[in-house]
Amino acid sequence: MSATKPTTLYDKIWNDHLAHEAEDGTCLLYIDRHLVHEVTSPQAFEGLRTAGRKVHAPEKTLAVVDHNVPTTDRSKPNPDPESAEQIAALAENAREFGVTYYNEFDKRQGVVHVIGPEQGFTLPGTTIVCGDSHTSTHGAFGALAHGIGTSEVEHVLATQTLIQKKAKNMRVTVDGDLPAGVTAKDIILAIIGEIGTAGGTGYVLEYAGSAIRALSMEGRMTVCNMSIEGGARAGLIAPDEKAYAYLKGRPLAPKGEAWDAAMRYWQTLRSDEGAHFDHEIRLDAAALPPIVTWGTSPEDVISITGKVPNPADIADEAKRLSKERALAYMGLNPGTKITDIKIDRMFIGSCTNGRIEDLRAAAKVAEGKTVNANVNAIIVPGSGLVKEQAEAEGLDKIFIAAGFEWREPGCSMCLAMNPDKLAPDERCASTSNRNFEGRQGFKGRTHLVSPAMAAAAAIAGHFVDIREWR
């Protein structure tokens, strides 16, 4: 009898959920969890209504408003009629189809990829989808999670399955100890800088190595969150005691004997020794600096001690022209020190860096300091429960005393779909995940950084090396 072939974590979860495979490789995958928000769901629910279908498994579906909700006073009407309409539609659709829904006044409300793990809806070994590209966040728990389009949202609502083709396996190993001031955000920005925004195309990434194991669950979520910016379908980290401890006792997590049974399965969720990966890359955590993006792609990364690069040094013409356009859009000149770049706005929040650990890191920097007079700085907790925890720890008082605005939970300035957005040519230090043209507002200029780096920039009025912060 032959031994079982060593298998990757991705392959294990895929195989456990494979319902059917056609000759051309097209597969039908069972979906365990479906997260829904107000932007990509209205047409999907309308499709069900038109066809006379029900939601196949409402108990496996969780809806929340996040993209369009104002982060200021919610007792006032939403200033954008289209946003208000989408929010009202989600409330009505959830009621009509029997789906659990967290509205903007529910303390469980927040960014969809913050509330999933927080509620214990996200579990190891599950397949999770959402009409949102940053669904890869949930891979921090060893779940196979990725974004889907609106037509696929309807398909999952109706059938609890998804049609797709299997991806390849890539392992990203990060070993060594992170230096002081260097965070999970810097790890993932460094990875994207290494592989480029297309480097992960066609792959599911598994993050491994001692530096990844050393991260908290919040840090692991930050890493997995930006897998899509590296071009990957999803990102995974094998679950361990940190993941189990995070989930135990959460409202929607298994209890009692069900927990014990789940644990027996979860403990098998790791890539076997000798499992084949189609591609491997390695990074040394000890060599990583605090990172800032300088251009209009998440791959445009540079050390805080660096200078804006010169596109003239790039041999490939298409790439050179692309980087010249990025510099023109960002209003930067080659050779400018990163620490000489002044900012107008600062945003701490999003599904990348809106969790309690992120707010603690920012508060440590902000305590006893004052936001620069030329900077508007907002802090948006990732959920109502994160906000509640931060306030219990007095973090809100630290921020407010320093001149930061303390807001209600939501996607906020991560994307220009709500009142929190940049004006043309405003420059923002942001803890979000995308620095594309117009992402935070028409002609807005975004630099991606860690929470501590963002807070320090807001206080100094320009980017500073957090390793030298006093």
From Swiss-Prot:
EC number: 4.2.1.33
Molecular function terms from GO: 3-isopropylmalate dehydratase activity; 4 iron, 4 sulfur cluster binding; metal ion binding
Pathway terms, separated by semicolons: Amino-acid biosynthesis; L-leucine biosynthesis; L-leucine from 3-methyl-2-oxobutanoate: step 2/4
Organism: Rhodopseudomonas palustris (strain BisA53)
Xref: InterPro entries: 3-IsopropMal_deHydase_lsu, Acnase/IPM_dHydase_lsu_aba_1/3, Acoase/IPM_deHydtase_lsu_aba, Aconitase_4Fe-4S_BS, Aconitase_4Fe-4S_dom, IPM_dehydratase_rel_enz, IPMI_cat
PANTHER family per UniProt: 3-ISOPROPYLMALATE DEHYDRATASE (PTHR43822:SF9), HOMOACONITASE, MITOCHONDRIAL-RELATED (PTHR43822)
Self-association and partners: Heterodimer of LeuC and LeuD.
Catalytic function, reaction form: (2R,3S)-3-isopropylmalate = (2S)-2-isopropylmalate
UniProt record, GO biological process: L-leucine biosynthetic process
Keyword Metal-binding attributed: yes
Source organism superkingdom: Bacteria
Name of protein: 3-isopropylmalate dehydratase large subunit
Similarity comment: family membership: Belongs to the aconitase/IPM isomerase family. LeuC type 1 subfamily.
Role of this protein: Catalyzes the isomerization between 2-isopropylmalate and 3-isopropylmalate, via the formation of 2-isopropylmaleate.
Enzyme class: lyase
Reported cofactor(s): [4Fe-4S] cluster
Keywords, sorted A to Z: 4Fe-4S, Amino-acid biosynthesis, Branched-chain amino acid biosynthesis, Iron, Iron-sulfur, Leucine biosynthesis, Lyase, Metal-binding
Sites where the protein binds [4Fe-4S] cluster: 351, 411, 414
Entry's cofactor comment: Binds 1 [4Fe-4S] cluster per subunit.
